[in-house]
From Swiss-Prot:
Key words, A-Z: Cytoplasm, Lyase, Schiff base
Protein name: Deoxyribose-phosphate aldolase
UniProt-annotated location(s): Cytoplasm
HAMAP family reported for this sequence: DeoC_type1
Main location: cytoplasm
Organism, as annotated: Haloarcula marismortui (strain ATCC 43049 / DSM 3752 / JCM 8966 / VKM B-1809) (Halobacterium marismortui)
Function: Catalyzes a reversible aldol reaction between acetaldehyde and D-glyceraldehyde 3-phosphate to generate 2-deoxy-D-ribose 5-phosphate.
Gene Ontology BP term (one): carbohydrate catabolic process
Active site annotation, chain numbering: D86, K147, K172
Lineage: superkingdom: Archaea
């Protein structure tokens, strides 16, 4: 595991996220060689501020937008400079058994932009059978990744969920991944990426383990950003 920083999407997605928070996230991503995951409004700021691979979230965090509006949001984020997009699955439609609607919605969003689209399935809200269904639906929609969670529902990424979802597509484990021990468990379960607001902590702990050292974690510099659950 020598490419860990490039597999971390350092995240700032809290409801009180400020431009200063976004710049801090980008500074940390640059310092540690990570990617960044930010709100769509912040993409123009980010592209002017730093050369960091950017993911923008779309229809976040509930995934209940109309298809046309979500496609438009995706196009705007891509046009502003986002390298990848994380959209949210409509969990209500999934639970109602509206599988065709779920798949068709994702298919249209994926087709609307020429960049990879990850689909957040909000795994903490789903049964194993629903995870299997949504994994297949997202794969059929030609998305690039399955992502476990937004971080806004109770619970987050689990090894069990990653093991199920990784049968269908590469997985971005997100939600509650706050340490290198957490991230390592997700990678070992089959995750390809990690999304975490504590990405800097994860990389420092990985570096320390690799060097046989320990580190003392400083307090976050990010005013108002929620760094407790990893998003």
């Amino acid at each position: 595991m020598d490419d860990i920083p490039d597999r971390i999407e350092h995240t700032v997605l809290g409801p009180t996220t400020t431009p200063a928070d976004v710049r801090t996230c980008l500074d940390e991503a640059l310092q540690y060689g990570m990617r960044a995951c930010i709100p769509p409004w912040a993409v123009p700021l980010a592209t002017e501020y730093a050369n960091v691979p950017l993911t923008a979230v779309i229809d976040f965090p509930h995934g209940q937008g109309q298809t046309d509006s979500v496609c438009q949001a995706a196009k705007l984020a891509w046009d502003a400079g986002a390298d990848e997009l994380d959209m949210v699955c409509n969990v209500g439609l999934l639970k109602a058994g509206e599988d065709d609607a779920v798949r068709d919605h994702i298919t249209e969003v994926v087709a609307s932009v020429p960049v990879p689209v990850k689909v957040i399935v909000e795994a903490p809200l789903l049964s194993d059978a629903e995870l299997e269904r949504v994994g297949q639906l997202v794969a059929d929609a030609d998305a690039a990744y399955l992502k476990t969670a937004t971080g806004f529902s109770e619970g987050g990424a689990t090894v069990h969920d990653v093991e199920i979802l990784s049968k269908y597509l590469p997985v971005k484990a997100s939600g509650g991944v706050g340490s290198w021990a957490d991230a390592k468990a997700m990678f070992e379960a089959g995750a390809e990426r990690i999304g975490a607001s504590s990405g800097d902590t994860i990389v420092r702990e990985w570096q320390a383990e690799t060097a046989g050292e320990t580190v003392t974690e400083p307090e976050s510099d990010r005013d108002g950003a929620d760094t407790t659950d990893g998003y």
